[in-house]
């Protein structure tokens, strides 16, 4: 269980000073994560002078920054010149925190500092496409999507992929939707040549593998894994149930190459894109559908009155041109693309869901 975060902003003489305390803390924490300062503090504490030697940071600079974090109760001190961990600072020695915090900090603040200028140019409206996003504008690539930008930054791209891999377990694959009907349908002799399941933009097949293992009646040879060509090349090395799955490179916004499949499954993809782009993705699938095809969208759902965490994530995703969506949002986008929303299977704990679309 992560520790609660100490906050002294309520002690500020004015709200503006409260935000100043928070801004300074955010910046110092970002630097200390980058320089691995938290990892160099032993459980018994350390002299700031010795910590300066271990980290290679000038003593005068380190003392000022550490003193602030002692004042803000991120650190504690037994006597002047000493610094000790608290549960909060100790948490930032963990790999998960060291990946997530810089990712959130860098992508949000790079964007937010440019919000006034971005919205002056683009109007006070949601980003209309991922290649015209606040993050791209703030990063100096105003015509590129976040994925195109990360391709230009190998270290950031590597850190991003590692961060996303950590979050895979936060959104369940199984336990919401009953996939067993797909395997039962596949037992019919007349459909032995039909594609049963297409995992659209499915990465290396983690979700598809979990589904095939949980529902062994679904025949792998009648399944397809799709993603960008470079991802598919890696996926071809898979063993186990994925070994005999067809691997097909795609352009997510181009023509869907697999026609007439029983199910098109798209997980953790649509929330990364604007409404117009989601409609484009779904229409490309709609054009490939048979009359009885279904589309399964596995995504996080935004409640009509979202709690603070989900509302914050939604605003953060705005920077990339994406958004968290509620049931009504998905229903409206489905209709624009030529589908009807037929059912929703939800996980109340994680606010995840599988939305089933049928051809309208």
Curated annotation (Swiss-Prot):
Cited InterPro entries: COMT-like, O_MeTrfase_dom, SAM-dependent_MTases_sf, WH-like_DNA-bd_sf, WH_DNA-bd_sf
Keywords: Methyltransferase, S-adenosyl-L-methionine, Transferase
Keyword Endoplasmic reticulum: no
Signal peptide: none
Ranges that cross the membrane: none
Sample GO molecular function, one term: O-methyltransferase activity
Functional pathway: Secondary metabolite biosynthesis
Class of this enzyme: transferase
GO biological processes: methylation; secondary metabolite biosynthetic process
Pfam family, one: Methyltransf_2
Keyword S-adenosyl-L-methionine in record: yes
Gene3D superfamilies: Vaccinia Virus protein VP39, Winged helix-like DNA-binding domain superfamily/Winged helix DNA-binding domain
Function of the protein: Methyltransferase; part of the gene cluster that mediates the biosynthesis of varicidin A, an antifungal natural product containing a cis-octahydrodecalin core. The PKS module of pvhA together with the enoylreductase pvhC catalyze the formation of the polyketide unit which is then conjugated to L-isoleucine by the condensation domain of the NRPS module. Activity of the Dieckmann cyclase domain (RED) of pvhA results in release of an acyclic tetramate. The cytochrome P450 monooxygenase pvhE then catalyzes the oxidation of the C21 methyl group to a to carboxylate group.
Similarity comment: family membership: Belongs to the class I-like SAM-binding methyltransferase superfamily. Cation-independent O-methyltransferase family.
The protein's name in its UniProt record: Methyltransferase pvhD
Organism for this UniProt entry: Talaromyces variabilis (Penicillium variabile)
Name of the gene encoding the protein in the UniProt record: pvhD
């Amino acid at each position: 269980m992560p520790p609660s975060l100490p906050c002294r902003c309520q002690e500020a003489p004015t709200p503006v000073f409260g935000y100043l305390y928070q801004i300074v803390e955010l910046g110092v924490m970002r630097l200390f994560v980058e320089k691995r300062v938290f990892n160099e503090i032993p459980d018994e504490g350390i002299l700031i002078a010795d910590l300066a030697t271990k980290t290679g940071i000038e003593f005068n600079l380190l003392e000022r920054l550490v003193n602030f974090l002692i004042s803000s109760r991120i650190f504690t001190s037994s006597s002047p010149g000493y610094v000790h961990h608290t549960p909060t600072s100790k948490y930032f020695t963990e790999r998960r925190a060291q990946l997530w915090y810089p990712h959130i900090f860098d992508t949000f603040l790079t964007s937010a500092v440019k919000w006034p200028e971005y919205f002056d140019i683009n109007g006070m409206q949601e980003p209309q496409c991922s290649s015209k996003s606040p993050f791209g504008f703030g990063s100096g690539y105003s015509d590129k999507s976040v994925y195109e930008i990360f391709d230009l930054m190998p270290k950031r791209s590597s850190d991003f992929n590692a961060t996303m891999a950590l979050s895979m377990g936060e959104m369940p694959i199984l336990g919401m939707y009953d996939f067993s009907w797909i395997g039962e349908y596949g037992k019919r002799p007349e459909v032995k040549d039909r594609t049963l399941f297409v995992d659209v933009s499915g990465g290396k097949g983690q979700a598809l593998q979990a589904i095939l293992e949980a529902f062994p009646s679904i025949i792998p040879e009648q399944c397809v894994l799709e993603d960008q060509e470079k991802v598919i090349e890696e996926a071809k090395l898979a063993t186990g149930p994925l070994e005999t799955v067809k691997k097909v490179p795609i352009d997510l916004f181009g023509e869907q190459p697999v026609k007439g499949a029983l199910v098109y499954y798209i997980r953790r993809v649509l929330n990364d894109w604007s409404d117009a782009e989601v409609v484009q993705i779904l229409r490309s699938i709609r054009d490939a559908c048979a009359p009885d095809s279904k589309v399964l969208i596995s995504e996080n759902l935004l409640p009509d009155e979202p709690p603070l965490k989900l509302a914050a994530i939604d605003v953060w995703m705005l920077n990339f041109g994406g958004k968290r969506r509620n049931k009504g949002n998905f229903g409206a986008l489905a209709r624009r693309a030529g589908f009807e929303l037929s059912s929703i299977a939800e996980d109340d704990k994680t606010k995840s869901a599988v939305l089933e679309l049928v051809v309208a």
